Amino acid sequence: MNQIEPGVQYNYVYDEDEYMIQEEEWDRDLLLDPAWEKQQRKTFTAWCNSHLRKAGTQIENIEEDFRNGLKLMLLLEVISGERLPKPDRGKMRFHKIANVNKALDYIASKGVKLVSIGAEEIVDGNVKMTLGMIWTIILRFAIQDISVEETSAKEGLLLWCQRKTAPYRNVNIQNFHTSWKDGLGLCALIHRHRPDLIDYSKLNKDDPIGNINLAMEIAEKHLDIPKMLDAEDIVNTPKPDERAIMTYVSCFYHAFAGAEQAETAANRICKVLAVNQENERLMEEYERLASELLEWIRRTIPWLENRTPEKTMQAMQKKLEDFRDYRRKHKPPKVQEKCQLEINFNTLQTKLRISNRPAFMPSEGKMVSDIAGAWQRLEQAEKGYEEWLLNEIRRLERLEHLAEKFRQKASTHETWAYGKEQILLQKDYESASLTEVRALLRKHEAFESDLAAHQDRVEQIAAIAQELNELDYHDAVNVNDRCQKICDQWDRLGTLTQKRREALERTEKLLETIDQLHLEFAKRAAPFNNWMEGAMEDLQDMFIVHSIEEIQSLITAHEQFKATLPEADGERQSILAIQNEVEKVIQSYSIRISSSNPYSTVTMDELRNKWDKVKQLVPVRDQSLQEELARQHANERLRRQFAAQANAIGPWIQNKMEEIARSSIQITGALEDQMNQLKQYEHNIINYKNNIDKLEGDHQLIQEALVFDNKHTNYTMEHIRVGWELLLTTIARTINEVETQILTRDAKGITQEQMNEFRASFNHFDRRKNGLMDHEDFRACLISMGYDLGEAEFARIMTLVDPNGQGTVTFQSFIDFMTRETADTDTAEQVIASFRILASDKPYILAEELRRELPPDQAQYCIKRMPPYSGPGSVPGALDYTAFSSALYGESDL
């Protein structure tokens, strides 16, 4: 173990300066108030012992017991749960200093910076330094991690105390000194978390010592928090020591933080009222569902119409995922709600007609047509949104590829150009020998060759930067700045190159010998080196392909490149042979010059390393291309798999639509048979849902693989979704229409033959075959059935069959009209006669009579809606059942 030299001191300052002490604060602490020192001794000793007892030991004198560093290291191991280095067991001073330094090293490793605390002061028993060190340990291991609403540790602990004691009288915690002198704050903290331990109402603000002692005794006995404070010291000190109180209060924080004939009449009234109540419930349910659906559409349309592009691929992928969630999770329930809303509306209107009630008119803006219009606007907003997202992702993908390519080429050029200006500015030729000047000239010629070889790269960098600007790359400013710097530097290099050549040519006449081997090496090595750099760039170049043909093209190009490697290796061997010849000449003639080539910056090691790098990159490129080829084959399989399913599902949906359409207009057979057939259709359709789900899964795989086209099918997932939703809506609506016809037939007493006759007449005059007759078709139908109609009579009939003024007559309205005069339905007169029986022939009825004869809820319904009776013989509490009955059938304004 290395010895720790005496005199080593730690000069660290903890980064969290909002609650860690600064060096100047330590200077002031050297003049610590004796009362504060006493409080800190007691508190810090108790705090240390509360942890040391877990290891079966304790301290008596804080500045003496830590001097050898053993218990200090043990304390740190207990509170951190980590092992410290093995202590030195000797008793000499340097052993003690070494142990204390190990403890201080561990504290510093936790990010704590100790100001002016050296191991010598601790070993010497300096009480100020010892207390400061223990306070630093308390801050790091007991207080630092306390955080409330992103506050610092001290502020977080204070805020925690303020919140916990806020409801208590006479408690106002503003600091960690004077706010705790009366002891009520400590008692309030205990009572807030353990009200069974203390009766706060019996505490006396004028007995601070008793309050503090009570709190500390309870904390020690029930909360395992040792006594760390002296009540008399806190009460009698004008400003108690803040560190002592913070240490003690933090123990509370850690302790507490871890811490679902008349009878016949009554039956008739109950039946009528039940129908009315159910109709009102359906009306309210329709209004509620319509409001919720319209509100959802209103909130969704702006989101779908937002075409603001994001700057990053991750953000656009998040938008695409949100849209997928909308199509998979949010929209399908709303499609069902819209369908259910139409079914409820038709059912309600049928029930109202059957029960001889007025037609239901939804509130303004909530008609079925209004909802259909809003839904159409939603579909219009949704159209093209996904295509826009995918186009944006392709654009960003292209941008990222170009940006990475720009960075690679720019980095390569900057690396090459680094230091070139300084080289060109040198005037070494002024003091060089004739041979050296000629060497400098040849070296400059090689540099010019290298410079010309880099011209293409600079042009490529500028072209890529221009394309990034045209595609609106989000970091175009930095790209332009970097490109401009490269171009400016390139211009300076050109100017400096020309000037240096002119200077060298002025001295060329002084040159007598040329080292042909060096010059030949320079001329051949520079292009070869540049070729290798270009080859490495090409081998590391990123590629993006979307088809097997594209990747095959890249593989072909790569194979062509590999075919050139033998020729390149021959060139490399020739260049190496030149250098070997140079070495041979130098050795043969004992020439005292460096074997380094004065005309070229390219070294043999550089050529070897780059050649090795090229050979390493070739198989890596092979693997990348083969992996991409495999991925493109997988994408092609996904396309074919999706197309096979879509080409089967699309015609199946169309066939089902045609079968349902034929079933809805058939004349022969009973309605129940037609219903059973439709139910079978519905069952088959529901069972077919698994095919749609599987297609959705394949479609998601295609999108996750970023496959953007599929030449194997004309069906897209959007076509299938729209067809499937239309099929579900059509079968549900058709079943509802047949159920309504059965309900009307049974309620009106129509035979199956009559129903078939009505259907035949309706189908004959339904010229557009859309289940509706306009006014002229309806008039022709009535005339064909023997009705002699004038304009007034026809207008009256139209108000019955087209109450909403839509200009069309449905099959259900046609049946209602044909059976209206002969059907056995209840009337207002029948209900009035029933009420008269319950009222014992009186023109009014009393609430008591209603409660006696009717069920409680329907009796209360009548009492709430019947107007007071004011006719002859009226008595207090008399109710007008005549007006009420007329209102039920829309014959009054009640």
UniProtKB/Swiss-Prot annotation:
- Which residues are involved in binding Ca(2+) 2? D802, N804, T808
Which coarse location class applies to the principal site listed for this UniProt protein? cytoplasm
Enumerate the residue ranges of region (Actin-binding): 1-254
GO terms under cellular component: cortical actin cytoskeleton; filopodium; focal adhesion; glutamatergic synapse; postsynaptic actin cytoskeleton; postsynaptic density membrane; postsynaptic density, intracellular component; sarcomere
Family, per the entry? Answer: Belongs to the alpha-actinin family.
Start and end residues of each Calponin-homology (CH) domain: 38-142, 151-257
Origin organism lineage: Eukaryota, Metazoa, Chordata, Craniata, Vertebrata
Question: Which parts of the sequence carry Phosphothreonine?
Answer: T237
Record-annotated residues binding Ca(2+) 1?
D766, N770, D777
So what does this one do? Answer: F-actin cross-linking protein which is thought to anchor actin to a variety of intracellular structures. This is a bundling protein.
What subcellular compartments does it reside in?
A: Cytoplasm, Myofibril, Sarcomere, Z line
Q: What is this protein called?
A: Alpha-actinin-2
Domain EF-hand, first and last residues per copy? 753-788, 789-824
Annotated InterPro entries: Actinin_actin-bd_CS, CH_dom, CH_dom_sf, EF-hand-dom_pair, EF-hand_Ca_insen, EF_hand_dom, Spectrin/alpha-actinin, Spectrin_repeat
Which GO terms fall under molecular function for this chain's record?
A: actin filament binding; calcium ion binding; channel activator activity; cytoskeletal protein binding; FATZ binding; identical protein binding; LIM domain binding; phosphatidylinositol-4,5-bisphosphate binding
Q: Could you describe the post-translational modifications of this protein?
A: Ubiquitinated by FBXL22, leading to proteasomal degradation.
Recorded hits in SUPFAM superfamilies, A to Z, give: Calponin-homology domain, CH-domain, EF-hand, Spectrin repeat
Q: Does the keyword Metal-binding apply?
A: yes
Q: Which GO terms describe its biological process?
A: actin filament uncapping; cardiac muscle cell development; focal adhesion assembly; microspike assembly; muscle contraction; negative regulation of potassium ion transport; negative regulation of protein localization to cell surface; phospholipase C-activating angiotensin-activated signaling pathway
The ranges of the Spectrin repeats are 281-391, 401-506, 516-627, 637-740
SUBUNIT field: Homodimer; antiparallel. Also forms heterodimers with ACTN3. Interacts with ADAM12, MYOZ1, MYOZ2 and MYOZ3. Interacts via its C-terminal region with the LDB3 PDZ domain. Interacts with XIRP2. Interacts with DST (via N-terminus). Interacts with PARVB. Interacts with SYNPO2.
What Pfam families would the database entry show?
Answer: CH, EF-hand_7, EFhand_Ca_insen, Spectrin
Per UniProt, the keywords (alphabetical) are: Actin-binding, Calcium, Cytoplasm, Metal-binding, Phosphoprotein, Repeat, Ubl conjugation
